[in-house]
């Protein structure tokens, strides 16, 4: 299986991906991934195969879901379903946030603060986040665009930020990074 991921600056990135995630960091810490989604199921659908692969490689994974995802549909506990799915994919920690669904563009500053807090305070001391998976900048959903914008600011010191595609909202997604997740 191949997972397609967009990176705005992907020159020579394929070799760097495997190196960064199959070893400890230069500081001797365990490698970590931060996966960010606007709604429950965005992470699972957008980069779930990659997360599963890297969890098997003992990479520490934190997933952040910005909204409960309850607008426009009959209420179900989507955070609980997302927690179960992300646990099956091997995520070590899920942080469900409660920003207002379909209104994230009004909450970008608060999302940036939340993500910066999570990076600083929710990452174990022996883990260094070296990669972020987040929404991509060609998405048409207003919440996805807002999460992309907040992620780019909050994660500016993390060496690699990759955007993933979510079904039905990306009309012009042009992947530049491909990950092989075959075992």
PLM features: what roles do these ranges have?
Residues 4-34, 106-183:
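Metal-dependent de-N-acetylase/amidase catalytic core
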Residues 32-40, 44-75:
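ATP-dependent adenylation/pyrophosphate-handling site
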Residues 41, 67, 82, 94, ...:
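Divalent metal-coordination and catalytic microenvironments
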Residues 89-102:
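A conserved beta-strand->alpha-helix junction
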């Amino acid at each position: 299986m191949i997972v397609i991921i967009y990176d705005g600056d992907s020159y020579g990135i394929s070799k760097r991906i495997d190196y960064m995630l199959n070893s400890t960091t230069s500081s001797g810490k365990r490698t970590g991934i931060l996966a960010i989604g606007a709604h429950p199921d965005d992470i699972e659908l957008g980069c779930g195969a990659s997360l599963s692969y890297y969890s098997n490689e003992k990479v520490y994974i934190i997933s952040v879901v910005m909204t409960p995802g309850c607008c426009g549909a009959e209420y179900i506990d989507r955070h609980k379903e997302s927690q179960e799915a992300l646990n099956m994919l091997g995520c070590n920690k899920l942080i469900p946030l409660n920003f207002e669904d379909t209104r994230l563009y009004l909450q970008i500053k608060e999302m940036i603060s939340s993500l910066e807090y999570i990076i600083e305070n929710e990452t174990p001391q022996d883990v260094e986040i070296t990669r972020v998976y987040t929404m991509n900048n060609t998405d048409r959903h207003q919440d996805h665009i807002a999460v992309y914008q907040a992620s780019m600011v909050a994660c500016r010191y993390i060496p690699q930020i990759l955007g993933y595609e979510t079904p039905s909202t990306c009309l012009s997604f042009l992947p530049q990074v491909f990950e092989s997740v075959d075992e």
